[in-house]
UniProtKB/Swiss-Prot annotation:
Record's function text: Transfers the gamma-phosphate of ATP to the 4'-position of a tetraacyldisaccharide 1-phosphate intermediate (termed DS-1-P) to form tetraacyldisaccharide 1,4'-bis-phosphate (lipid IVA).
PANTHER family associated with the record: TETRAACYLDISACCHARIDE 4'-KINASE, TETRAACYLDISACCHARIDE 4'-KINASE, MITOCHONDRIAL-RELATED
GO cellular component, one term: plasma membrane
EC number: 2.7.1.130
Family to which this protein belongs: Belongs to the LpxK family.
Pfam families in the record: LpxK (PF02606)
Reaction equation(s) it catalyzes: a lipid A disaccharide + ATP = a lipid IVA + ADP + H(+)
Source species taxonomy: Bacteria, Pseudomonadati, Pseudomonadota, Alphaproteobacteria, Rhodobacterales
Protein's pathway: Glycolipid biosynthesis; lipid IV(A) biosynthesis; lipid IV(A) from (3R)-3-hydroxytetradecanoyl-[acyl-carrier-protein] and UDP-N-acetyl-alpha-D-glucosamine: step 6/6
Enzyme class (EC, first level): transferase
Keyword Lipid biosynthesis: yes
InterPro entries on file: LpxK (IPR003758), P-loop_NTPase (IPR027417)
Protein name per Swiss-Prot or TrEMBL: Tetraacyldisaccharide 4'-kinase
């Protein structure tokens, strides 16, 4: 289900829907405040780095976790991801194995993350952390755990889509937030806004220094150079992510000729019937069917080879604040160039 449009109105231009739902938003915010105030049930003997958000929905957490997996690996640190496994049926803790698990079992995000390093699915994050420690983890990357009090966190990084920012600044259902901005940022150590320069400028205009007083990282999602020539490719594109239009825009930036686009719900199941229909649509237009890297792991195995995916990676404009935070957490780690 797509979020309502009024969630992303400017914070100084609230409509009647946001105002009418504000009392329910206050109840939601109070429930979140009570939850995050609980003392952690488990403090692992290794550093815990949390990647989360204040907004509901997609903000770029998965590419951020992938980037941290690669950064920590370059320091010689065995980092294990612990994820709830949204969309999967396994409660865990279970180590994700792309050779035997599918997205219906463990969720699409853990399945993708497992390609970059050890990844655990666990409804009980503390149990997942214990399993990771027992398997030799030297650090835990807690995926989407910012409002989860189960684990004590050593570093919390909040990720925001720079174009959308914090939406209208109101809490669900009056807006897109899981908790008020000021309250959430007060618990965070780093803020990462993801988007091109124009989006970063928009974020600054709406949420500038008066709101953001913690170290602020900026980054953008850039297509991974795989040797694939995208320019001039006729494509029918589909995406079941938080903001499908961002993916379609990225394809156009690569010179792809979009014959049709199909925005799907976030994490929407991709059954053979749907993909066969999209493949037929692409064939009728003399085009190639294209999707995101995250959607690709949900494709039926028998049709996966007929769909192209465009992988993207997070590129940080300035990683000084992140490097300093990691140096503090891992003072004895050796950076490898």
């Amino acid at each position: 289900m797509r979020p309502p449009g009024f969630w992303h109105a400017p914070p100084d231009a609230l409509g009647w829907r946001a105002r009418a739902l504000a009392p329910l938003g206050a109840l939601y915010a109070a429930a979140t405040a009570r939850r995050v105030a609980r003392p952690p049930a488990h403090r692992p003997g290794i550093p815990v780095i949390c990647v989360g958000n204040i907004n509901a929905g997609g903000t770029g957490k998965t590419p951020t976790v992938i980037a941290l997996q690669m950064i920590l690996a370059a320091r010689g640190i065995a980092a294990h991801v612990v994820s709830r496994g949204y969309g999967g049926r396994l409660e865990g803790p279970v180590a994700v194995d792309p050779r035997r698990h599918d997205a219906a079992e463990v969720g699409d995000e853990p399945l993708l993350l497992a390609a970059f390093g050890p990844t655990w699915v666990a409804r009980d994050r503390a149990a997942g952390a214990r399993a990771a420690e027992g398997a030799g983890a030297q650090a835990i990357l807690l995926d989407d755990g910012f409002q989860n009090p189960t684990l004590a966190k050593d570093l919390s990084l909040v990720v925001v889509d720079a174009q959308r920012g914090f939406g209208n600044g109101r809490v669900i259902p009056a807006g897109p937030l899981r908790e008020p901005v000021a309250r959430g940022l007060a618990r965070a150590d780093l803020l990462l806004t993801i988007g091109p320069p124009a989006a970063q400028a928009r974020f600054d205009a709406l949420w500038g220094p008066a709101t953001v007083t913690l170290p602020h990282l900026r980054g953008a999602l850039t297509p991974l150079q795989t040797g694939m020539r995208w320019e001039g490719l006729r494509a029918v594109a589909f995406a079941g992510i938080g903001h499908p239009q961002k993916f379609f825009d990225t394809l156009q930036d690569q010179g792809v000729i979009l014959c049709a686009t199909h925005p799907l719900d976030d994490h929407q199941p991709l059954d053979a019937r749907l993909i066969t229909r999209l493949l037929a649509d692409a064939k009728a237009q003399g085009a190639q069917l294209v999707t995101t890297e995250k959607d690709a792991v949900r494709l039926p195995a028998e049709l996966r080879g007929q769909v192209l995916s465009l992988p993207v990676r997070l590129a940080l404009a300035d990683d000084t604040a992140l490097t300093a935070a990691l140096d503090t957490l891992f003072p004895n780690a050796t950076r490898r160039l």
